[in-house]
From Swiss-Prot:
Domain of life: Bacteria
Entry keyword set: Isomerase
InterPro entries (UniProt xref): NagB/RpiA_transferase-like (IPR037171), Ribose5P_isomerase_typA_subgr (IPR020672), Ribose5P_isomerase_type_A (IPR004788)
Catalytic activity of the protein: aldehydo-D-ribose 5-phosphate = D-ribulose 5-phosphate
Designated name of the protein: Ribose-5-phosphate isomerase A
Family the entry assigns: Belongs to the ribose 5-phosphate isomerase family.
CDD domains: RPI_A
Amino acid sequence: MTQDEMKKAAGWAALKYVEKDSIVGVGTGSTVNHFIDALATMKADIEGAVSSSEASTQKMKALGIPVYDLNSVDKLSVYVDGADEINGHMDMIKGGGAALTREKIVAAVAEKFVCIVDNTKQVDILGKFPLPVEVIPMARSYVARELVKLGGDPVYREGVVTDNGNVILDVYNLKIINPKELEEKINAIVGVVTNGLFAKRGADVLLVGTPEGVKTFTA
């Protein structure tokens, strides 16, 4: 089974967490694209979706799934999204696709976070994948200096502007032993919008595509 086939299996497995007549929170990325394809098969049974990125919004609209503004929605029963890394405590690094802030906002609203990944994303310790930090453009150099003080090697992701008009610093060489603490420390730096650690709001359910099929883990 190829990596993409494992992603597809995880994406389709998430359908069982979608409630009838609900509005579904939808994340961003290659695994989520498979979930969107799956969601389109039951679009008549749901009210619609809230999206965490322009890319996912366009894909859903093209498939005929109604997309709502989060401000017009009182609650989301479920949010389905991928991860760049996830540990055994359901803490994640996300934001490889630069949609981390909107992903974090939608995740905060949702009652349940279902994370869908292939088995290459499971790790014991977070940090091998560079940690994305979304930054107000004028604060980029200052934030980079502060991130160095925290032990990281920040690299400006050139040519990338987020959906919110900000820039991304990817922080390398972090061995993240206490994800919640580091998430709070980075978010406390003036000029940081948010960072890609999802530890304060981790996943509730993890669906992992493996060569043997989809494995389910719960927090």
